[in-house]
């Protein structure tokens, strides 16, 4: 017997749409580079509403796929620790969740104005200028 001809489109013809849960399949996601997935996931609006057409089990399964992708990103980061800047203790290097916490792009940044600001007119400046 032959299979039914109503098969889904081939994975390469399907596109990943973060707002459409039906595109959260490994067949589709496998063909996207990590950078493209990150950019598309970061572009999801904060107030995105998922239609009620999906069952709770299906929604939970798709959320688990997304979590697996996130853990995969953390694993890629962990395997490349020797090729990037070392993580600082500020980001809890040795806690229980450090293995799955992504730290891509995290840096210690301080506004330069805090450390380079000089205050003119302080009492010490007045003492120097009058002597």
From Swiss-Prot:
Record localization: Virion; Host nucleus
GO biological process entries: viral process
One Pfam assignment: Herpes_UL35
Keywords: Capsid protein, Host nucleus, Virion
Residues in coiled coil: none
Keyword Oxidoreductase: no
Key word Isomerase present: no
One Gene Ontology term, aspect cellular component: viral capsid
Location, primary (coarse class): virion
Subunit structure: Interacts with the major capsid protein/MCP.
Sequence similarity: Belongs to the herpesviridae small capsomere-interacting protein family.
Cited function: Participates in the assembly of the infectious particles by decorating the outer surface of the capsid shell and thus forming a layer between the capsid and the tegument. Complexes composed of the major capsid protein and small capsomere-interacting protein/SCP assemble together in the host cytoplasm and are translocated to the nucleus, where they accumulate and participate in capsid assembly.
Name the UniProt record assigns to this protein: Small capsomere-interacting protein
Lineage, opening ranks: Viruses, Duplodnaviria, Heunggongvirae, Peploviricota, Herviviricetes
Gene that encodes the chain: SCP
């Amino acid at each position: 017997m032959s299979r039914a001809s109503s098969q889904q489109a081939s994975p390469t013809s399907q596109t990943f749409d973060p707002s459409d849960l039906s595109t959260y399949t490994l067949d589709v996601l496998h063909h996207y580079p990590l950078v493209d997935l990150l950019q598309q996931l970061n572009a999801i609006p904060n107030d995105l509403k998922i239609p009620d057409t999906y069952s709770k089990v299906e929604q939970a399964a798709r959320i688990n796929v997304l979590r697996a992708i996130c853990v995969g990103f953390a694993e890629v980061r962990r395997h490349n620790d020797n090729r990037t800047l070392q993580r600082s203790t500020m980001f809890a290097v040795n806690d229980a969740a450090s293995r799955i916490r992504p730290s891509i792009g995290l840096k210690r940044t301080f506004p330069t104005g805090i450390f380079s600001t000089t205050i003119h007119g302080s009492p010490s400046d007045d003492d120097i200028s009058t002597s």
